[in-house]
Curated annotation (Swiss-Prot):
The keyword Transmembrane applies. GO terms for biological process: photosynthesis. Keywords: Chloroplast, Membrane, Photosynthesis, Photosystem I, Plastid, Thylakoid, Transmembrane, Transmembrane helix. This is Photosystem I reaction center subunit VIII. May help in the organization of the PsaL subunit. SUPFAM superfamilies: Subunit VIII of photosystem I reaction centre, PsaI. GO terms for cellular component: chloroplast thylakoid membrane; photosystem I. It comes from the Eukaryota. Pfam families: PSI_8 (PF00796). Belongs to the PsaI family.
Length: 36
């Protein structure tokens, strides 16, 4: 039962965390370069 309910929690978590990390790293990259 734990193995069955694990993906249903893990998939949305990755779907929310991964874009957040990507946007955070992108904003840090832009602030570091100060091109704009």
């Amino acid at each position: 039962m734990i193995t069955f309910s694990f993906p249903s929690i893990f998939v949305p978590l990755v779907g929310l965390v991964f874009p957040a990390i990507a946007m955070a790293s992108l904003s840090l990259h832009v602030q570091k370069n100060k091109i704009i």
